[in-house]
Amino acid sequence: MTTSAASWRSDPADPSVASARERALRQRSEGRVRITASAFGGVTRLTDLAEGGALRARLPRGGPGLEAVIVNTAGGVACGDVFSIEAKAGPGAHLTVATPAAEKVYRSDGLCADIQVRLVAEAGARLDWLPQETILFDRARLRRRYEIDLSATASFLSFEALMLGRLAHGDAMGEGHLEDHWRLRRDGALIFADALRLAGPMGALLARPAVAGGNRALATLLYVAPDAEARLEEARALLDAARCEAGASAWNGLLCVRLLAPDIETLRRDATSFLMAFRNAPLPRVWAT
């Protein structure tokens, strides 16, 4: 017998509350988006776009290269959600990927939300991955995986910011689960692997000096390009005016900047100033809305 979602919820023979796994599987959101940008005579154009589920791509006009804004029509991320994003900049193309607002990750009944991101920049391409911050609510559970494949002559810039809890609303993140896995390859060789895992009492974990020193907002910027190491002193000089804790290092053609702040407003202000100066270009317009 086939049972609809409505009858499943109201069936008196079932427990009044389904297990977390059953509930998540029935209510979860899924979304997929794939974008390819190609260069034609020095102009970057969209050459492939595939969308499915809750994810959509919008292409505002103006600015250098092609700008794609990924929209989550589900209004946030909940337990059991599965999202996949792929973006590719073909030879000589310039693609910027952003999001229209902060992404909210809501309280989970047990399952992790999964987000998979795959980014590719081919010979001479430039790819900027610039989503706005992700905010984790109390008891949120999030797992993200990033796979980046670059040509040796490509340029890649990414910025990812996290806020654990909603301090502006007086909501601390007491418990939760966060995993971030990064794998970055240049011409097929692994040059950067990073893994972050925080699980359990978030307040106690973040208070540790070796973790966040009591800060609740954290961000990582990566820049991979032929001139990455040569720009280290420039990056450090730009960070001198930062109000948050910040540091930069460079090795093997990669520049990494880490930022920590007590709140997302401080981190966002410093990050915005840094990104605008370092990129020598305005941020995506959605950052100002």
UniProtKB/Swiss-Prot annotation:
The record's annotation in InterPro entries points to: UreD
> Which keywords does this chain's UniProt record carry?
Chaperone, Cytoplasm, Nickel
Keyword Chaperone present in the record's keywords: the answer is yes
Which GO cellular component terms, listed alphabetically, does the Swiss-Prot or TrEMBL entry include? cytoplasm
Query: Which Pfam family would be a valid example here?
Result: UreD
Chief localisation class: cytoplasm
Lineage: superkingdom: Bacteria
Subcellular location per UniProt equals: Cytoplasm
Q: Name one GO molecular function term.
A: nickel cation binding
- Assembly: UreD, UreF and UreG form a complex that acts as a GTP-hydrolysis-dependent molecular chaperone, activating the urease apoprotein by helping to assemble the nickel containing metallocenter of UreC. The UreE protein probably delivers the nickel.
Alphabetical list of HAMAP family matching this protein: UreD (MF_01384)
Assigned protein family: Belongs to the UreD family.
Q: Any idea what job this protein has?
A: Required for maturation of urease via the functional incorporation of the urease nickel metallocenter.
What protein name is recorded for this chain? Urease accessory protein UreD
Q: What is the lineage of its organism?
A: Bacteria, Pseudomonadati, Pseudomonadota, Alphaproteobacteria, Hyphomicrobiales
The gene designation is: ureD
